[in-house]
């Protein structure tokens, strides 16, 4: 079956594995009987997100390509040569041209896992998607695509299969994993875009290994919303996780698509397809690509996954939240918590003097808001980077510099 957060109630799809082999349970999310949906769990459940749509989701396994500007030594630029999100509609390339450009960078991922049953150990297979991010075999996908895998196979668009594949790192907070195909030097990497300039209503394309059977299936749609927060679990009610700052799209994201690319019409990767709403049509979600640029830099430099860490608990401010709690701004990150300190002791934030009740409005001059959630903005950086935060404290604006730490799993 596909290893995904899936929209189907019985989210089980057979792969090419023998019928006697059990399939992996898909991550399932069931919506409540009626809206509004229950809030996702975050560090701040008390204030969190009366405005947040909490949807039970199923993760979707998909693979996509990221065209990075790399030479044979894997020197990589994560800044696109142009902003493909603001291209005028009249000059947008056709979907077919986008697919022609990106398909070689989108791979199918097949995993083997061992499951314990009342009859003993049994082998199960699952399928998802991935994105080529370097010529020498680094692949970006969702963590849930390769979770508990004993073996991983990567299949290119032309059918070439590689079995010498290792999981080189995971970022559980972003549901991201990195794979490495050993012994390759000539893969085509996908081009990484800039998710900070994505517009609601913008046309997008999704590619993935639909149902684990239909390699590089293409769908198209628009960005339906930004800054979504979600809560997801598997079919058994386990594997609960919260995801924030997500893009919402009506481009079809099928079981098996998790880990694949969400693309603008310039053929740039702007998101990683990750989840769909259960019991709904045309509601899929993708992780903004900027949120993983920091860990991507770390992996491409030959290091393990290192996620930048600041050490605060906060609430994303919305206009409704600002009105309810009489906050001075309608957007930003409100440093607050319910029953714990909102600034962790000895953290980078603590050392920089961040205090409970501060409102962070900018990161290195970029406004915190719907298009640029605080976690996504920090996710662009790596440990030891210094960022300047603009904050409101007692009604007065000031700036502080924070040296980011490394998140410890």
Where are these regions (language model features)?
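N-terminal targeting leaders characterized by basic, low-complexity, disordered sequences
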Residues: 1-35
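Flexible, small-residue-rich helix->loop connector segments that border functional cores
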Residues: 98-99, 357-360, 389
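Acidic- and glycine-rich mobile interface elements
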Residues: 186, 333-343, 361-366
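Conserved PDZ fold ligand-binding element
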Residues: 139-140, 346-371
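Serine-dependent protease modules
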Residues: 2-4, 8, 42-49, 53-324, ...
């Amino acid at each position: 079956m596909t290893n995904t957060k899936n929209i189907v109630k019985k989210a089980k799809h057979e792969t090419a594995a023998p019928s006697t082999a059990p399939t992996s349970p898909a991550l399932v999310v069931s919506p409540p009987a009626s809206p509004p949906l229950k809030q996702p769990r975050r560090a701040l459940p008390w204030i969190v997100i009366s405005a947040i749509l909490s949807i039970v989701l199923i993760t979707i396994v998909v693979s996509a390509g990221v065209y990075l500007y790399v030479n044979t030594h894997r020197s990589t630029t994560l800044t696109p040569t142009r902003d493909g999100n603001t291209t005028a509609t009249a000059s947008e390339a056709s979907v077919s041209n986008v697919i022609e450009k990106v398909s070689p960078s989108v791979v199918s991922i097949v995993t083997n896992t061992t499951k314990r049953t009342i009859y003993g150990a049994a082998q199960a297979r699952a399928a998802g998607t991935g994105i080529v991010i370097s010529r020498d075999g680094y692949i970006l996908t969702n963590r849930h695509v390769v979770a508990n895998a004993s073996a991983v196979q990567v299949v290119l668009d032309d059918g070439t299969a590689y079995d010498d594949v290792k999981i080189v790192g995971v970022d559980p907070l972003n549901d991201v994993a990195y794979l490495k195909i050993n012994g390759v030097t000539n893969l085509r990497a996908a081009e990484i875009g800039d998710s900070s300039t994505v517009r609601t209503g913008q046309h997008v394309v999704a590619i993935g290994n639909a149902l684990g059977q239909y390699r590089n299936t293409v769908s198209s749609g628009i960005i339906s919303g930004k800054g979504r927060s979600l809560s997801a679990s598997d079919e058994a009610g386990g594997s609960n996780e919260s995801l924030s700052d997500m893009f919402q799209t009506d481009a079809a994201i099928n079981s098996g698509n998790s880990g694949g690319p969400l693309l603008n019409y310039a053929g740039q990767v702007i998101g990683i397809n990750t989840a769909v709403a259960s019991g709904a049509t045309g509601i899929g979600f993708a992780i903004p690509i900027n949120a993983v640029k920091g860990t991507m830099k770390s992996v491409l430099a030959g290091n393990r996954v290192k996620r930048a860490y600041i050490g605060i608990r906060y609430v994303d401010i919305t206009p409704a939240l600002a009105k309810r709690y009489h906050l001075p701004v309608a957007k930003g990150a409100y440093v607050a918590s319910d029953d714990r300190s909102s600034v962790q002791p000895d953290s980078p934030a603590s050392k920089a003097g961040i205090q409970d009740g501060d409102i962070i409005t900018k990161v290195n001059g970029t406004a915190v808001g719907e298009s640029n959630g605080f976690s996504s903005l920090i996710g662009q950086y790596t440990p030891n980077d210094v960022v300047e935060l603009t904050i409101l404290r007692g009604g007065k604006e000031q700036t502080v510099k924070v040296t980011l730490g490394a998140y410890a799993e």
